[in-house]
Every structure is written in C-alpha cells, then in structure tokens.
Design a protein with these regions (language model features):
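Phosphate/nucleotide-binding beta-alpha loop and adjacent structural elements of enzyme active sites
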Residues: 1-222
Length: 222
C-alpha cells in the first residue's frame, strides 16, 4: 500500500525557486512530467540506465543513457526477466521472488558524466544506489539545493545501504529532511519511502527555506 503526501505544498508555501532538475533513475520519465506540472519552465535532464525506455524519454525531454555509481568501473547489473516489470533493475538485486538476470555494465560518477554542471534539485530512484552516487560525487551534490530520494528501511535490495545509514550520511554533509512524498508499506513493514532533503550547509544557495524559522501554531488539536 502506498501512502501519498503533498510534497509540492512545501515548495509552494516556501516559494522555493527551482530552475533546474536532474532526474536520476528516470524510468519512463513520469516523475519529470509530474514535476513540470508544478514548475512548467524548469530545465530538466533525465538519466536512465535502461535503453528500453528511450521512446518514452524522448517524448518527455532531454535524457542520457547511463548507469551511475560511486566509481568509474564495471559492476554487476540486475535486470528483471519480465520486460513489463523493469522498475527493479539496478546494481543491488531485489530481495523478492521476482526473477532477475545479471549482466556486466560500465558505471560512471556524476562528476565524470556531467562535469561542471549543477542542478537545483536532484531526484534519485535507483534501487539502493543513492548513497553510492552521492559519495561518488560530493562536490556535485553540494551544489544542489534539494535532494529527492527513494530510501529503504527494509532490506529490499540486497546489500544496499539502509535508509538510516543514508539519512545519517546526509546529515553529516549538511542535508536535513524537510518533507515526504510517499511511503510504501507491505505486510505492515515500510518497504520504501521518498523523502526530500534541503541543503543547509551551502550558504550560497537560495533554497527558499529557513530550517530555523519559528513555527507559529494556530492551536493544538485536542
């Protein structure tokens, strides 16, 4: 069961300026399409590892086919054998009953793929590789105002860093949680959640949000 929240309320209330977004793990481009409904003039770039989705990506906007990670190296890449169920493809194999086959793929870092570029918001939905990508290009990440990440408290992808580990690392480098997009629950357990983080360390960024702003309550619920 997926519990949806209203992340764009945060952006609207705080009048957050977003001029550019990077959609990593774009799949068929649906996230970018939804984001553009709220920020129609935003400049977007999608990165997707699966070439099967090129036709969908072309209809959405600019894209690059690439597999991102912590280093420039070859890695095992797991592909779902069911072509209609490709959202689980990635470096960390799903801990499910779904059959996957493994191939070898060239992996690259954000710094190597997009040298000198920066984006106001970076979204990642990469089956447990979020922390690898962040650690592989810390300077690139430091230039982002916001990170929109899929995280996994449950061991959904074998060997992938847990949500707690990712959140702890982000706190160390100056990113704090501000809101939630969705929580995916199965058998009473949180399988995954999409969380949004603000960069509070890079003072040169105009995030539109003051994490220390006093909260004004109109009243407490009884």
């Amino acid at each position: 069961m997926i519990h949806k929240f209203e992340p764009f309320e945060f952006f609207k209330i705080n009048k957050v300026p977003i001029d550019s977004v990077l959609d990593i793990g774009a799949h068929k481009g649906k996230w970018t399409q939804e984001f553009k409904k709220h920020y129609p003039d935003v400049k977007s770039l999608m990165i997707e590892a699966n070439a099967d989705h090129i036709d969908d990506l072309i209809r959405t906007g600019h894209y690059i086919l690439a597999l991102l990670g912590k280093d420039n190296e070859e890695v095992d890449y797991y592909m779902c054998e069911d072509k209609n169920n490709t959202e689980g493809n990635g470096v960390y194999k799903e801990n499910t009953n779904v059959p996957f086959k493994v191939t070898r793929r060239k992996c690259t870092t954000l710094d190597s793929l997009l040298p000198g570029q920066k984006f106001d918001l970076i979204k990642m939905d990469v089956q447990g590789s979020e922390l690898d990508i962040i650690q592989g290009s810390p300077g690139f990440i430091h230039q982002a105002k916001y990170l929109w990440l899929e995280l996994q408290p449950h061991n959904y992808n074998i060997g992938a860093p847990s949500a707690g580990k990712v959140i702890g690392y982000l706190n160390q480098i100056g990113f704090e949680i501000v809101t939630i997009d969705e929580i995916n629950v199965g058998n009473g357990v949180i399988m995954g959640m999409d969380m949004i983080f603000v960069n509070i360390r890079n003072k040169n960024l105009k995030t539109g949000y003051d994490i220390n702003k006093k909260v004004i309550w109109n009243g407490y619920a009884s």
